[in-house]
Design a protein with these regions (language model features):
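Hydrophobic alpha-helical transmembrane segments of multi-pass integral membrane proteins
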Residues: 1-378
């Protein structure tokens, strides 16, 4: 589908507050729905950012300027690539939750332009000024939060406000990260806060969509061995996970972090088992959602091991960033892109290869600690 196509609108609305919703009357089809520019932009930026980071590690280029190369890499994975995919998901999911038409057209163009500006400015912080680059980038998540909050409130879907709490935490973490980078430091607390916020979103939203999609798939084939419906156990698992992540964010080396992380690992492993993911093996688009969620209990175990000085803290971050965040985002991107463009929900060979490669990356990085001689190759 070409980006130069135009899309007519039926019943485009402009509610109080001035945010037009619905498909644009004319203009590029890429700005007709939030997932189109942000999924594409996020995917392309993930590739570009990793190529630049590898080139910097190899000594071919200088990266980040006064912002710092390690800061740039951490930031662009957490707040560059990941925030784009999160934006694409929320701008697609929130209309489904609220029953309102999606934000599109010029507001979507401006929001995407703001995200792009953040990427460009942080590539040349010495040229535009580190403070200017950080300020421009720091505006994106609050802008996304404002749009999503307005839609949820206008739709009176109060139960969905909890999702916006994670987005608020990300906005704060981004600002704290920038402040630390400007001072020449890498804010580990801000990094853990951001990772925790994304993980909480996966716990909440994943707990909503994974069993639902699984149930629908089983029902289509006349199966009755459905996932266990949401009940008090799920609430306990969510609260336990939040407590463990909060402890890890503030006191990552404490014994309390070990205890809460191991308890959360058990609760979320049991939660995953209750969803009966093994029954979905023939459907790769669905089974990868279960695989992504499986990295949550794995991540909690990694937190405990790191607190006991058995595993490096950077490996913990990679279990969450690549395993939980990366795999879940890839799973959601492929499913939403297929579903919202009217195509069959089936993974191509290339898509399956991407699933396998990302899962392998999430496993190999912590495994490399036990084979230090092969660290760079792995």
């Amino acid at each position: 589908m070409s980006g130069s196509q135009t899309v007519p609108t039926q019943g485009r609305s402009r509610p109080k507050g001035g945010i037009p919703r619905g498909l644009a009357r004319s203009g590029p089809v890429i700005f007709s729905y939030g997932f189109r520019p942000f999924f594409l932009g996020g995917a392309l930026w993930a590739i570009v950012a990793m190529v630049l980071w590898i080139a910097a590690l190899s000594g071919f280029i200088d990266l980040g300027g006064d912002y710092g190369a390690p800061n740039w890499h951490a930031h662009e994975m957490l707040f560059g690539f990941a925030s784009a995919v999160l934006a694409g998901f929320l701008l697609t999911a929130v209309p489904n939750w609220t029953g309102r038409l999606p934000v599109s057209g010029k507001p979507l163009v401006w929001l995407f332009a703001l995200w792009c500006a953040g990427r460009i400015f942080l590539l040349v912080p010495d040229t535009v000024g580190v403070v200017t680059a950080a300020t421009v980038d720091g505006l994106f998540l609050p802008a996304l939060l404002t749009i999503c909050a307005r839609e949820v409130i206008a739709g009176r879907k109060w139960k969905d406000l909890k999702v916006l709490g994670g987005l608020l935490a990300l906005s704060v973490a981004n600002i704290v990260f920038h402040l630390a980078a400007i001072e020449g430091d890498l804010s580990q607390t801000a990094t853990r806060l951001a990772v925790s916020a994304y993980t909480v979103l996966v716990i909440i939203v994943g707990g909503r969509i994974v069993p639902s999609f699984t149930r629908n798939w089983l029902n289509r084939f006349g199966r009755t061995d459905f996932p266990v419906p949401y009940n008090g156990f799920d609430t306990a698992a969510i609260l336990t996970g939040i407590a463990a992540l909060a402890t890890w964010t503030m006191e990552p080396e404490s014994m309390l972090a070990v205890i809460t992380a191991l308890l959360a690992a058990f609760m979320h492993a049991m939660r995953l088992i209750r969803w009966r993911g093994w029954t979905t093996w023939p459907d790769q688009v669905l089974v990868v959602l279960h695989a992504a969620y499986a990295f949550i209990p794995a991540g909690f175990i990694a937190i405990a091991l790191a607190a006991l000085d058995v595993m490096d803290t950077r490996s913990v971050l990679h279990v969450f960033t690549v395993g939980v965040i990366g795999c879940m985002m890839l799973a959601v991107m492929t499913r939403a892109s297929l579903g919202h463009t009217g195509r069959k929900l089936a993974a191509s060979k290339v898509t399956i290869a991407a699933y396998v490669a990302l899962i392998a990356c999430a496993l190999l990085r912590p495994a490399a600690e036990f084979f230090p001689g092969a660290m760079m190759r792995l």
